[in-house]
Amino acid sequence: MSEEPTTDMPTKYDPTAVEAGRYQTWLDQDLFKPSGDKKAKPYSIVIPPPNVTGKLHLGHAWDTTLQDIIIRQKRMQGFDTLWLPGMDHAGIATQAKVEAKLREQGISRYDLGREKFIQQVWDWKDEYASIIKQQWAKMGLSLDYSRERFTMDDGLSDAVKKVFVDLYNKGLIYRGEYIINWDPQARTALSDIEVIHKDDKGAFYHVKYPFADKDYTFNGKHYIEIATTRPETMMGDTAVAVNPSDDRYKELVGKKVILPLAEREIPIIADAYVDPEFGTGMVKITPAHDPNDFKVGNRHDLKRINTMNDDASMNANAGKYEGMDRFEARKAMVKDLEDQDLMIKIDPIVHSVGHSERTDVQVEARLSTQWFVKMKPLAEQALKNQEGDDAVDFIPKRFEDAFKQWMENIHDWVISRQLWWGHRIPAWYNKTTGETYVGVDGPKDPENWEQDPDVLDTWFSSALWPFSTMGWPNTDAEDFKRYFPTNTLVTGYDILPFWVSRMIFQSLEFTGRRPFKNVLLHGLIRDEHGVKMSKSLGNGIDPMDVIEKYGADALRWFLSNGSTAGQDVRFSYTKMDAAWNFINKIWNASRYVIMNLGTMDKPELPAASDWTLADKWILSRLNATVKQVTTTFDKFDFGEAGRALYNFIWNDFCDWYIEMSKEVLTGDDAQAKANTQNVLAYVLDQILRLLHPIMPFVTEKIWLSMPHVGESLVVAAYPVDHPEFDDETAESDMASLIELITAVRSIRAEANAKMSSAVDLLIKTDNTRLQAVFKANEDYIQRFAHPKTLSIGADVVAPKLAMTQVISDAEVYIPLAELVDLDEEVKKLEKEQAKFESEVARATKKLGNERFVANAPEDVVNSEKEKLADNQTKLAALKQRLVDIKAEA
């Protein structure tokens, strides 16, 4: 049921009162669900599912605000809209949070066991999913909760299993022993893009590797020199390599050296991998601890010796160092090498070291048996698709190049994770034969099989999000048929390789279509100094705190108005103050309009023949704004749309049209009053509709307080182009009047004269069109410029003593005597003259001092000369002005 209009609006905008209960009302009215109108064009967005690791941050607020603006506008434009909500289980991140919580209680996941630990994670998920939904409500997001999904829902889990099994059967998923990135704190494999490289202090350790043949020397030495940054992996060395084209070391190939500390012989081999220009041109080969060494080892059939446990402590292969942490082992080995005279030197360096994105610990390259996706065929398909009609449109366009570059240089994707929270890999191993079974449902004799304990990378299920949430693999599902592919994805550019790229290749592989028509990539939220917000820096801001102080609409306005595709945005409370002030301006303007509408049922524009110049102008400006906002929204240029709205509302509507309406509304002409009331109501109604996608709460409150038709702005029609409103002449004429009135106000302000004081106003112009405009609209000039006499024409003679403003095709004069007391002006100018004379004398004396000119820096001397010249010019003008005023007085 629609709320009744009211004129009882508080004098000040109170976001808490405005927003209270409104969201629940929208939900009760079922306004966020698709219309179900089969004749309407569908428009769908799936929310990038936030991780259930914790509360939403400002980045989420920005991301979802942009999506809500899009979906609200499309809904108002008559599209059959679906904005599908959901959340991500976020395997490693959520498990790490729960493990940290348990550690505070002195408990590990191993103490609980898999089943009880997973229940703890589900409890965590339920707690934070509830918090996230409360935050969505506070933000005013128009999500269809009847379709809410979670990446570990039964339906989505079925999709995950089907994709895994199908890729396996196609030969695109395989299991093997390879070097992978290993997080020793989470004790799981990581993909390349889950590794963040940071500059760390380290060292090159130059170590002697003695020849096995004690009688052999090379360059007069019984050893070769090997430089390494990781002496802790030495116990896993199985060769030393040189480049086959490196003539310096040809005689060494085939020789053997003694591995220091291990006293084990290893060969010197030739392999093109070695860069002869780097270091000594000789490198140690550790196939179990380096991806490049692993490849070299495969080519030369070298043994793989893993020297670390999964927590990065040393294992039995490390000999006496077994049980030590890797960094403790490094120190111990370095000391032993020094004690045995095997350390030549240590050179400190700063080098790039991989760290886990989630735990921030240094990642290990580790030999491990894992599941992988063979990426080349999938990447090639995605690249080919970008050349056709079904290509994904990247906004900004430059990110398509980043996408292509990543696809062209892609590595196989390690998808298994040694975690407990996530989608269990649908693979089983026969307890007797070791045979592998991969299937959606599992073996029929489960007692003879053991399921792989690992889970899938979080991004594996997230990559299916656009179509799995629509009912796939059931391709006959109504939502899948109507709303897939989705229209727009809005997300941060930082997850282009993690998520966007993977959704594209998985969607193409399993549906034959792109997952979304376009992807809008925004930047990061930074603080007012340009520093990325983070918990560790303590500069993060809770969006709920901002909403509590300023309201959701102000935050949404700031986030949308500061948005330029692909760019970062800086948060500042100064900008939030400005956002609140703008909404307060809208509130007060609306209050004025509503209080002056009388008993109107609904706004109806008067006949065009009854429009005043002000009416014609405001309707033309409104239509220009409608077209500009619609166009910029279609381009996802929210910042430009916001600027257009701000300029029209603040400048055109509030500062001018409302002011022009006041005399009419208080006048005796009933018809003119009714006409102005209707134009005011119509324009305000259109403003509220234009603003609603950005500021849903306050616009709804105001709209329901004024005469209206319909239950909610949520489903009201969005403004459209009215060509009959376009009026270039009215816009030009009003622009001239505004420029004139502004010029008169500037003169008064400069003279510190009252704005309402009556003055002689002279306008000199030989533009006959401009003369006609000013003469035809003397009532506006009288109302806003307050002239006691008005002279307009080409023959207007400028008073000898007047204040002047130049405007387009005209000069504006007001006699000085009408603005100021000439005797007082003389006194003021004489004081200024004395000040300038003193300054000129000071500078002249200083520049006449030869020691100053000779010894002071050149820029200081030049600055003093410039000041003197400037003050001399001002003094001369001041003296002439005094002469003129005294002559007049």
UniProtKB/Swiss-Prot annotation:
Coiled-coil regions listed in the entry: 816-889
Gene Ontology cellular component terms for the protein in this record: cytosol
Enzyme class: ligase
Major localization listed first in the record, in broad terms: cytoplasm
Reactions accelerated catalytically: tRNA(Val) + L-valine + ATP = L-valyl-tRNA(Val) + AMP + diphosphate
Residues reported in the UniProt entry to bind ATP: K535
Ranges spanned by the short sequence motif 'HIGH' region, renumbered to the chain: 50-60
Tree of life domain: Bacteria
Keywords for the protein's UniProt record, in alphabetical order: Aminoacyl-tRNA synthetase, ATP-binding, Coiled coil, Cytoplasm, Ligase, Nucleotide-binding, Protein biosynthesis
Motif mapping: 'KMSKS' region: 532-536
EC numbers for this chain: 6.1.1.9
Subcellular locations according to the entry: Cytoplasm
PROSITE patterns with a match to the protein in the record: AA_TRNA_LIGASE_I
Pfam families listed in its UniProt record: Anticodon_1 (PF08264), tRNA-synt_1 (PF00133), Val_tRNA-synt_C (PF10458)
GO MF terms held by the record: aminoacyl-tRNA deacylase activity; ATP binding; valine-tRNA ligase activity
GO terms of biological process kind: valyl-tRNA aminoacylation
CDD domains: Anticodon_Ia_Val, ValRS_core
PANTHER family from the UniProt entry: VALINE--TRNA LIGASE, CHLOROPLASTIC_MITOCHONDRIAL 2, VALYL-TRNA SYNTHETASES
Oligomeric form and interacting partners: Monomer.
Known function: Catalyzes the attachment of valine to tRNA(Val). As ValRS can inadvertently accommodate and process structurally similar amino acids such as threonine, to avoid such errors, it has a 'posttransfer' editing activity that hydrolyzes mischarged Thr-tRNA(Val) in a tRNA-dependent manner.
Family from the record: Belongs to the class-I aminoacyl-tRNA synthetase family. ValS type 1 subfamily.
Name this polypeptide is given: Valine--tRNA ligase
Organism: Lactiplantibacillus plantarum (strain ATCC BAA-793 / NCIMB 8826 / WCFS1) (Lactobacillus plantarum)
Designated gene of the protein: valS
